């Protein structure tokens, strides 16, 4: 059932040290229409946005939503947590017919409840394409909100953060890469071992030739700080770069950017500076570039409380500058013990500045997911907290 709900629109103006940016709350969730939005927003050519919330709705198992260009919301589907799945994670993708595809971390197979791959038609009918069994075919987990699908020749490719080969961090399984057809047939393309090739695969990207690229988050038990990999059209996996940890970053997360020269840009959740961090021993994270020869350059090291820590989404490239958000850091107050998070910009040469520091009030707190841009260079993102207590979608004009 589709429900159209009014938007709460709040505008806040602030002045940064170098220039004035405009920040406004595009939509504030109220639990009935969703709670804790996560993952990247998808924008269509008409200016509508699509996304998911992990919680909220009538069953508190999350929803799929649409926001129009003015921020008015339509609930497209409410998950029950049963065989239809629940607690959706990551971004949705949309095909040319207007169907949406995504992943849930709960529900599906009643003996496991390990999540699903779903298709939501334009008319609002949800079809479960695959229910994970939790063994060799993989399993999803709500602690991994950064996952998503890519479509190549009409077939869906994605990561399962757990399952597959056992032996990684509490025997959760090291994760798999899979393919699901429109008819619902799943094929496991690769099972990670947690050793030199890494474990816990993250969000994926593809190139025009159909090759798949991504990162593994690393395994504490295996002593692996994460990798970048390529899966070619024959199913062969090649490790392109292995993170050494420390100052170079630990646990690359979220979707990568890859330019025409084969240079990857991304973020690590940990590593880098270990002072003034919410998880001090792990580090506050870095922004990195890895060239086609496998050489890494650290563009920015997070660490100062006011500057943000623990990147909470991938990078958005706008005219050679990279925009992103951090989960912690920024403004520390009674709402946010480790800081409410920030939106930042970093240039290709490493110049860094903060565009907005969340306060934990009506402007939101704890941003999650990558930013999405429009034709006017406005940026849109989500926070899992703040607003009415259920998170917000925000708009910022750099």
Residue ranges and their predicted role:
Residues 2-398:
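Extracellular beta-propeller repeat domains
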């Amino acid at each position: 059932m589709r429900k159209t709900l009014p938007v709460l629109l709040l505008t806040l103006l602030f002045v940064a040290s170098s220039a004035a940016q405009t920040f406004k709350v595009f939509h504030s969730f109220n639990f009935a229409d969703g709670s804790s939005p996560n993952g990247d927003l998808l924008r269509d050519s008409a200016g509508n946005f699509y996304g998911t919330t992990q919680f909220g709705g009538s069953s508190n198992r999350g929803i799929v939503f649409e926001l129009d260009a003015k921020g008015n919301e339509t609930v497209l589907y409410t998950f029950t947590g049963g065989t239809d799945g629940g607690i959706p994670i990551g971004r949705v993708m949309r095909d040319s017919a207007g169907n949406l595809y995504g992943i849930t971390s709960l529900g599906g197979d009643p003996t496991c409840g390990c999540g699903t791959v779903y298709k939501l038609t334009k008319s609002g009918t949800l079809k479960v394409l695959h229910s994970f069994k939790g063994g060799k075919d993989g399993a999803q987990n709500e602690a991994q909100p950064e996952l998503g699908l890519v479509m190549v020749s009409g077939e869906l490719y994605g990561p399962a953060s757990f399952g597959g080969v056992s032996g990684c961090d509490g025997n959760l399984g090291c994760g798999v890469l899979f393919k699901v057809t429109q008819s619902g047939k799943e094929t496991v393309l690769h099972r990670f071992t947690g050793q030199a090739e890494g474990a816990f695969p993250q969000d994926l990207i593809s190139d025009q030739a159909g090759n798949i690229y991504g990162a593994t988050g690393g395994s504490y038990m295996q002593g692996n700080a994460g990798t970048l990999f390529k899966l070619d059209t024959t199913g062969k996996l090649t490790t392109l770069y292995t993170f050494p940890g420390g100052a170079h970053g630990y646990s690359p997360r979220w979707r990568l950017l890859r330019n025409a020269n084969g240079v990857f840009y991304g973020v690590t959740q940990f590593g880098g500076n270990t002072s003034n961090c919410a998880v001090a021993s792990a580090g506050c994270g870095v922004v990195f570039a890895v060239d086609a020869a496998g050489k890494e350059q650290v563009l920015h090291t997070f660490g100062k409380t006011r500057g943000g820590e623990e990147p909470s989404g991938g990078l958005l490239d706008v005219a050679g500058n990279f925009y992103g958000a951090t989960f912690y850091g920024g403004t520390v107050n009674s709402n946010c013990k480790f800081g409410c998070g920030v939106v930042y910009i970093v240039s290709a040469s490493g110049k860094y500045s903060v565009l907005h520091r969340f306060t934990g009030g009506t402007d939101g707190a704890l941003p999650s997911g990558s930013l999405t841009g429009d034709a006017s260079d406005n940026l849109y993102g989500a926070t899992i907290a703040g607003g009415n207590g259920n998170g917000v979608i925000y708009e910022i004009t750099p």
